[in-house]
From Swiss-Prot:
Cofactor binding note of this UniProt entry: Binds 2 Zn(2+) ions per subunit.
EC number from the UniProt entry: 3.4.11.4
Binding site for Zn(2+) 2: D142, E177, H381
Catalytic activity: Release of the N-terminal residue from a tripeptide
PANTHER family the record matches: PEPTIDASE T
GO cellular component: cytosol
Keywords carried by this UniProt record: Aminopeptidase, Cytoplasm, Hydrolase, Metal-binding, Metalloprotease, Protease, Zinc
Active site: D81, E176
Name of the featured protein: Peptidase T
Cofactor: Zn(2+)
Binding sites annotated in the UniProt record for Zn(2+) 1: H79, D142, D199
GO biological process, one term: peptide catabolic process
Amino acid sequence: MKQELIERFTRYVKIDTQSNEESHTVPTTPGQIEFGKLLVEELKEIGLTEVTMDDNGYVMATLPANTDKDVPVIGFLAHLDTATDFTGKNVKPQIHENFDGNAITLNEELNVVLTPEQFPELPSYKGHTIITTDGTTLLGADDKAGLTEIMVAMNHLIHNPQIKHGKIRVAFTPDEEIGRGPAHFDVEAFGASFAYTMDGGPLGGLEYESFNAAGAKLTFNGTNTHPGTAKNKMRNATKLAMEFNGYLPVEEAPEYTEGYEGFYHLLSLNGDVEQSKAYYIIRDFDRENFEARKNNVKNIVKTMQEKYGEDAVVLEMNDQYYNMLEKIEPVREIVDIAYEAMKSLDIEPNIHPIRGGTDGSQLSYMGLPTPNIFTGGENYHGKFEYVSVDTMEKAVQVIVEIARRFEEQA
């Protein structure tokens, strides 16, 4: 199983599937279509049935039941795309067997070093096989680790028919990283009563609370003139963007928050004197606080418009997803089964809120309650990203055990 995980994962991460916030196509990048087509063929090779990829790039497949019991149909999901925060092109995964727990030089030329000082969890992976980047790209364990685990788990169930299970549905979705994963997901066609996203982090992660999330695009319009004669004429769009950011509470940013604390996060800022564009994400677990944060952004924009003119700042803000807890609580047994599955495998469940989002956040509101399970990755979305193959193996075992327990309890 370990070699299959390594082989699949290292092959999958080499395919550039970064999504693109600016694109209006579905999916937003051709790499996701390419990857989806590959997975369709591999799902068929494994032996799954009803394997499809629709025009929007959503891949679905079925592992038929091997029991006569009336078992609820369950699903397992992962996403095709990788994050836009750092380059995902030309990923060169590096395999470190029997990791010694010490610093790893990812790229000697660029002096990129993965250190325990910066990442204190690193020594806990001593003895594991871990896969890192070469220091020039992200790895893409989010979510190709989860995707790999689902593929390997389905293969394992097919080759071990003594493990009884009900009908299992599998889905791989595009554009999760930009909040559009479930936008065209056909819940009815998927046909599951419940599902699990394999999109978590370290060993034991079990999550069924997520942020309420919104995205805000701000366009700042300036007036450019020669700087030598600019007095009372020039309006610097980049300075307007800086002024806007200055209104936000400094301590309410990702680098200063944890647990149930929300934040404003400036994802990118590009521009010049004439025009600048800033992209923010807004996050909070509490719905009232979430609405208050959005109103704060609107009020800052209004203040600046009154100061500089209506055209100086243009705001586009959209909700992306909501806290899934409200939809999971009525079917709490799906969390309990995952919890019991982990305990039976000597994995200590680590239940905590997702400081991020998964497709499950939106799917839960679309009628498909979907908690999230660990995949084994650390430091997502950057050059220090890595994954433990040993933990990936545990994730596969959890998928298999969840399927077995649903059948057993039917």
